[in-house]
């Protein structure tokens, strides 16, 4: 816990050390993510600009926004896990169909049994485990807890911008 507090204070000191009269936040999360990726690409002399696709990253970030803020997630506990019906309309339903199955693969790679079923306006996600402690965790995490699992997101965004990966 102390390390976390120190990390936060260090980050605040770093921001203050840059300049107390200049803003440091970009004003919008997707904008800031794209800005950070572009800065990384510009700093890398090996960036192949003929493959860079910032538009694909932007579309993915819009999908993330749709799934996070607009998707409806109806969660039902099962004896061995959870079943979640994730639905939306229009762009939200499309984003759900792109993102949820991809994340089910990530969950399976983490040792849970995750499956999806396509629905007309979304996806049904079922995540189960034979381990009672994991079942408790699955029920606590719920839909968004599953979506944020793993540390692949930032690397995935950089790969997407480089034209190396898409959902």
List the model feature ranges, each with a label:
Residues 1-167:
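Intrinsically disordered, low-complexity terminal tails/loops enriched in metal-binding residues
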């Amino acid at each position: 816990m102390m390390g976390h507090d120190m990390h936060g204070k260090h980050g605040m000191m770093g921001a203050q050390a840059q300049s107390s009269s200049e803003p440091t936040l970009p004003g919008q999360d997707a904008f800031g993510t794209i800005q950070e990726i572009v800065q990384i690409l510009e700093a890398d002399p090996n960036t192949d600009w003929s493959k860079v696709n910032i538009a694909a990253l932007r579309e993915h970030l819009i999908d993330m926004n749709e799934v996070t803020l607009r998707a409806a997630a109806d969660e039902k506990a099962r004896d061995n896990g959870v079943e979640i019906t994730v639905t939306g309309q229009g762009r939200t339903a499309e984003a759900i169909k792109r993102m949820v199955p991809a994340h089910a693969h990530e969950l399976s790679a983490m040792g849970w049994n995750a499956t999806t079923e396509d629905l007309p306006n979304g996806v049904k996600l079922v995540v189960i485990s034979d381990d009672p402690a994991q079942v408790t965790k699955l029920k606590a995490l719920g839909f968004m807890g599953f979506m944020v699992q793993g540390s692949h997101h930032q690397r995935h965004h950089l790969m997407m911008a480089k034209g190396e990966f898409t959902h």
